[in-house]
Amino acid sequence: MKKEEMILVVDTETAMINPTAKVSGCNSLVYDIGLAVANRKGEIAEKRNLVVNDIMFGEYKRMETCYYAEKLPQYYVEMGTGVRQIVSLETARRIVLELMEKYNIKKVAAYNMMFDYYALKKTNEFLGGKFEFFPEDTKYIDILKMARGVFKNNKRYSNYCYENNLLTENGNPSISAENVYRYITNNPDFVESHTGLKDVEIETEIMAYLNNRKCKLNRKIAFNY
């Protein structure tokens, strides 16, 4: 019997290196990593909630100006109670490699995968690391690209966005993770947590929903950087 394929879903929260520059993975330092090992149905086998101490505490000036700085008190409380595991970036990488080996994972997924990939890469470089965060042969799945493929010209989704004012600055239907999750759960009042683990859980649900809509995790979606 063929063993079920497992995927590592990742979400990062970041502080900007240069607060006045454009938001991008290459201008970001990762302080929070959410990890979920899941199958194509979105069933989670294992999850981790990691805080990168080198950035959270070592770059406190930048942390004060991060996009979701108002959530920092929540982090401090949860770190104190053990809900969040405080680690170095190198230890976070070791945990990722152990999970990938344990579940024979070859694919890593994220909503806007390029941002998370380059944010982790830039954080590693910033801290003087010489390693690649993920194994060299890893395939990457961008859940955002999957969502665009399913919802871009979907009249029902567009109508839902217009009815609930879930629009971009240009007035087009938004395909953010928050708004896609609002649609698939029919909960227009849902507010994304913008913390690593909580966000990775909803992104796993979105991935499963899209996969059920025949948006296959094929070579057009899974790619190398």
Predicted feature locations:
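Short, glycine/acidic-enriched loop or turn micro-motifs at the edges of active sites
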Residues: 12-16, 145, 202
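Conserved protein kinase catalytic core
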Residues: 17-19, 148, 205
